[in-house]
Regions:
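Conserved small-residue
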Residues: 2-699
Length: 699
């Protein structure tokens, strides 16, 4: 049992402490709170919120995600905080109120709504065109609110974490370098592609200088005190596809777009269009040294370009450095970078140089629980899995000679593809370094061509004290655009063709060697309802492993599914409500504690849940294990500001842990006022420190 009384969520679970015969009476009514709800005896302090001052002239960004405390002394150090994206509805509703600046939001939104398909190619407009200038201003503000915040903090005598405002406090944003000269640097083979003076695609003329970093979702902290920051859903900001030489598709291929519609999450896409961003410079791993006020980030291209999530880092003396990461897309791969050189002292900052040379591998999972690593290099054979091996019956492969990708649904087409292209090098052009760079730039599609296993949205990757790797696979559903997981590896417990609710996998390298080329794997936790064998959560996302090996996990259900009414599990036409829409049963995104050893191993205990429309992200434990830092992202994303404490009563067709159906009446706040929690307060993404009131370790 955990050292806390689990929080009661909306769904009966085996670990709730409510006996089977009392579940219907105990769960027939439920009230959701617009707050961070924690067990009795725990509290939280707000450290920083969107709009707070950073340095002399900057402000804390939007949608904080991964965070890391790099301690420079006991209970003192730097918080490195990612800012993933902006949530268009609450961001545009409250920007002037919070930031104090007027943006031409209404005019541009109206223009986008009136444009064909809601899209405007601002890059094709004249520089002095008023519409282009307005789109530029909004895109610049949105990109500024992404990136990274570095703030100094310490725990005071009362046990409360507070900011100390050091000279190293700073922002690295999506527009760093655009006007201030603070370009990001790069290492590795893709730099040779960035330096091309001419090529098949768009070239920004900046060579290896890179403007900014954006879509910064998850990350990882190195033993030597730097932070690896991911660039995830860059494909919504800049063109993802590339040509065979690794150069980018034109700016016009991803116009500016203001997405809005019934049942949709409002979004502002194509922000790189007006700003002139070269697509192949985004989707990388950025290394930051928080204590160096002059460090504005380095993109290490040997780690590949894809929709990066968290990093599992193994740095052991006398061994090669190993960095794991997942590509968070439906059909995304698990990757491993292995350095050419070896680690001498895991705490030496010289280890950053090891990220500049090595090899990137993608995982091949076998259904029998074994697997191997496939090198993404020019002489690797082309050998993709068949489309029919996947849940959705489709795989995406590099398209030649046109560039970009093509969807393949016919098993017979794979043989023809292999006949035409024998190795990965046949799919890309340039000298040896440029060709390797192009493979890394196109990592996901190169990995598909090489036969790496398409998986179920791999999000966080974390290393346990014994060297085991834990991976959160968020969702096993298919996508008509991206693809889907391998159906013999990612199986639904109910016999259905796909499983939306996710898994947590444990992977052990052969001989526990970070550089091993083979491994074993097993699923150790399953999302879903208890009656189906699940643990009561949906869509596991970020992981944090404590000193005892226990997993702290947060969920990432799509905001539009939170508390969506499920009055019946059968639709009016007699068909079943989809797994995706059943996620309304699970309430808000939540926080869980999962022991990995002892009598409670593999059980999941709810530690809490977040405010309305939010995702609780970036769990990070202080070295003394007394503080859990969390980033509360996008409160109010779907409904915006909660007006006059509005709420609705909704019906949910719930099930007990043994499958008996009953109806739950649930009161649901509409929108959010967190963290202020006063009527009509603007919802603001914020970083919090969770602690026990008595100051003891969390668990």
């Amino acid at each position: 049992m955990p050292p806390f009384t689990p929080v009661k969520g909306p769904m009966p679970v085996e670990t709730s402490g409510v006996s089977l015969d009392r579940q219907i009476s105990q769960y027939s009514t439920y009230t959701v709170k617009d707050d961070v709800v924690l067990p009795t005896g725990y509290t939280y302090d707000i450290i920083a919120s969107w709009g707070d001052k950073v340095g002399t002239a900057d402000h804390f960004g939007y949608n904080n995600d991964y965070l890391s405390l790099v301690e420079t002394a006991p209970n003192e150090g730097y918080l490195v905080v990612n800012h993933e994206y902006i949530s268009a509805k609450p961001w545009s509703q409250t920007y002037k109120q919070v930031i104090g600046v007027d943006l031409p939001l209404a005019e541009v939104k109206a223009a986008a709504m009136a444009a064909p398909d809601g899209k405007i190619d601002a890059s094709s407009l004249l520089n002095n065109d008023p519409l282009r200038q307005k789109i530029y201003a909004i895109s610049k503000a949105a990109q500024y609110d992404q990136g990274i915040s570095i703030i100094s903090v310490r725990k005071n005598a009362n046990g409360v974490w507070e900011r100390t405002y050091s000279r190293a406090d700073r922002r690295i944003t999506g527009i760093s370098g655009l006007e201030d000269g603070r370009y990001l640097k790069s290492t590795g083979p893709a730099t040779a592609v960035f330096k091309k003076a001419s090529g098949q695609g768009f070239i920004d003329g900046l060579g290896d200088k890179i403007i900014g970093t954006h879509q910064n979702c998850s990350g990882g902290t190195t033993p030597w005190g730097t932070v690896l920051v991911s660039e995830e859903n860059f494909q919504g900001e800049v063109p993802e596809p590339v040509y065979a030489d690794g150069t980018s598709f034109p700016l016009s291929s991803l116009p500016f777009q203001w997405v809005t519609g019934e049942g949709e999450i409002e979004d502002i896409m194509g922000q790189g269009n007006a700003l002139g961003y070269q697509g192949n410079k985004y989707g990388w791993t950025v290394e930051i040294d928080p204590v160096n006020p002059n460090d504005f980030g380095t993109k290490h291209t040997w780690l590949g370009r894809y929709r990066h999530e968290g990093y599992g880092i193994r740095a052991e003396a006398g061994k090669r450095l190993c960095v794991y990461s997942g590509c968070d897309r439906r059909s995304g791969h698990l990757y491993k970078f292995v350095s050419t050189g070896t680690v001498r002292d895991p705490k030496s900052k010289a280890n950053s140089r090891l990220l500049e040379d090595g090899m990137l591998y993608a995982a091949k999972f076998n259904p029998d629980g074994t697997g191997r690593w496939i090198a993404l290099k020019a002489d690797t054979p082309v050998n993709p899995d068949l489309p029919s091996a996947h849940v959705g019956g489709m795989i995406t492969l590099p398209k030649r000679p046109n560039g970009g990708v093509e969807k393949v649904t016919d098993d017979g087409a794979i043989a023809a593809f292999k006949d035409q292209f024998k190795t990965l090098g046949d799919l890309y052009t340039g000298n040896a370094t440029e060709k390797q760079g192009a493979i890394l730039i196109d990592a996901h599609f190169a990995a598909n061509a090489a036969g790496a296993t398409c998986t179920a949205r791999p999000e966080d990757t974390d290393i346990a004290p014994d060297g085991s790797l834990f991976i959160a696979f968020t969702s096993g559903s298919s996508s008509s655009s991206d693809g889907s997981p391998h159906k013999e590896v990612f199986k639904a417990p109910t016999g259905e063709s796909q499983w939306e609710y996710g898994w947590i996998m444990k992977l052990v390298e052969t001989n526990n060697d970070p550089a091993a080329m083979t491994f074993r794997w097993e699923m150790m936790a399953l999302g879903g309802e208890p009656a189906d064998g699940g643990l009561g959560f949906a869509n596991p996302d970020n992981l944090e492993i404590d000193a005892k090996g226990n997993i702290w996990m947060v969920t990432d259900m799509s905001t539009d599914k939170h508390n969506t009414e499920v009055a019946s599990r059968i639709k009016s036409d007699g068909s079943k409500v989809s797994q995706s829409n059943l996620r309304g049963l699970y309430g808000n995104n939540s926080i869980w504690y999962i022991p990995t050893s002892g009598p409670s191993a593999g059980e999941a205990y709810m530690f809490g849940y977040g405010p309305m429309d939010c995702e609780t992200t970036g769990p990070f434990l202080s070295k003394d294990q007394t503080t859990l830092f969390l980033a509360v992202q996008h409160p109010g994303e779907y409904h915006g500001v909660r007006e006059n404490m509005k709420s609705e009563v909704r019906k949910f067709a719930m099930r007990t842990t043994d499958g008996k159906e009953f109806m739950q009446t649930r009161e649901v706040p509409i929108g959010s006022n967190w963290p202020g929690k006063q009527p009509n307060d603007p919802p603001k993404p914020s970083v919090i420190a969770v602690r026990r009131i008595n100051g003891a370790p969390l668990a």
